[in-house]
Amino acid sequence: MAKIVVTGGAALHGEVSISGAKNAVLPILCATLLADEPVEITNVPHLHDVVTTVKLLGELGAKVTIDQGTLSRGSAIVVDPRPVNQHVAPYELVKTMRASILVLGPLLARFGAAEVSLPGGCAIGSRPVDQHIKGLQALGAEIVVENGFIKASAKRLKGGHFTFDMVSVTGTENVLMGAVLAEGTTVLDNCAMEPEVTDLAHCLIALGAKIEGLGTARLVIEGVERLSGGRHEVLPDRIETGTFLVAAAMTGGKVTVNRARPNTMDAVLSKLVEAGAKIETTDDSITLDMQGRRPKAVNLTTAPYPAFPTDMQAQFMALNCVADGVGVINETIFENRFMHVNELLRLGADIQVEGHTAIVRGSEHLSGAPVMATDLRASASLILAGLMASGDTTIDRIYHLDRGYENIEEKLSSLGATIRRVP
């Protein structure tokens, strides 16, 4: 099983380009099932979860064409949903990736039936699917959960009013996709406002959907008879953007991230400024300059967008490990999302966990050690800590990393990091 070895000590300098957003491309690929003509998706990152989604679309009968036949950086994927002849998403694929549940709404809306295995994929909490089920039931779907499958049917979904009990990104996306082909008008309240949800809505609109309220907690969808083909470019990944900016801040370097979307980064950028970074932005780039200084510890609480993202919590914990002062991190989104703490402790970090709160006392010195990635963002935090540790840090189970970061070792190497992948 492959590992990544990081040798610490180098400040990062240079420029790096950001890939398409993992959390946008997965629902957008699933949304192609709603169309009755081919759909082209561009700026697709080469990630394991994208490969899994492409396999799932193929299992359902869709014809998927990837430029040059393989997924390379910034690929284009054309999905032709016309040959779809299955409505069952099998356990073998769904168990490896929770986002597989995002075919539920499209299959139900387009073909009147869907069977999706209950999801697996992440070890960071229960992430209940009840909001998906309740939302689609509010649109007239008949749904039962049996034998490990969500089984849904409806002749045609009908517009309705549904308020999410809790903010759910994938729940919002699934019900939104179901509503675009429903008969009549649907009003969804307490929707997730994440940029990736808005990007999905922009894609649906490009295919002919009628959606109002983008970027707000209320979405109003006027159902249409059909969605046509079209083209959509996936927005840049704000979590990858934040990860590289934190790496620059931790190492006292200066890095410019290009092909970024600064207007989706307010919460993260404000915390980096609080940590002592000098930041300049353009419409599509962010430059962070630490001017050789050690970062200051920051306090943060994760919450739904536009507040601080849970997907950046582990990276900022790594920053606090080497910062000047004490930082308090409150995790309010997922339980069990401090699994990286024990691995950071192996590098010499000083962290105390009390329930959903971690108290991090900054240290001027970390030392390299073998560590194990436990989930996607935890694996990134271990790489960041490794950049600051003396000697080598060897990170095992990096298949987590490949689910959400495209060529991270190449990109970090281009900025001056000593990092390599080994068998």
Curated annotation (Swiss-Prot):
EC top class named in words: transferase
GO MF term set: UDP-N-acetylglucosamine 1-carboxyvinyltransferase activity
Database matches in CDD domains: UdpNAET
Coiled-coil region(s): none
Protein residues bound to UDP-N-acetyl-alpha-D-glucosamine: 98, 127-131, 311, 333
Catalytic activity: phosphoenolpyruvate + UDP-N-acetyl-alpha-D-glucosamine = UDP-N-acetyl-3-O-(1-carboxyvinyl)-alpha-D-glucosamine + phosphate
Domain of life: Bacteria
One example of a Gene Ontology biological process annotation: peptidoglycan biosynthetic process
Location(s) in or outside the cell: Cytoplasm
InterPro entries: Enolpyruvate_Tfrase_dom (IPR001986), Enolpyruvate_Tfrase_sf (IPR036968), MurA_subfamily (IPR050068), RNA3'P_cycl/enolpyr_Trfase_a/b (IPR013792), UDP_GlcNAc_COvinyl_MurA (IPR005750)
List of catalytic residues: 122 (proton donor)
Involved pathway(s): Cell wall biogenesis; peptidoglycan biosynthesis
2-(S-cysteinyl)pyruvic acid O-phosphothioketal PTM positions: 122
UniProt-recorded name of the protein: UDP-N-acetylglucosamine 1-carboxyvinyltransferase
Top-level taxonomy: Bacteria, Pseudomonadati, Pseudomonadota, Gammaproteobacteria, Lysobacterales
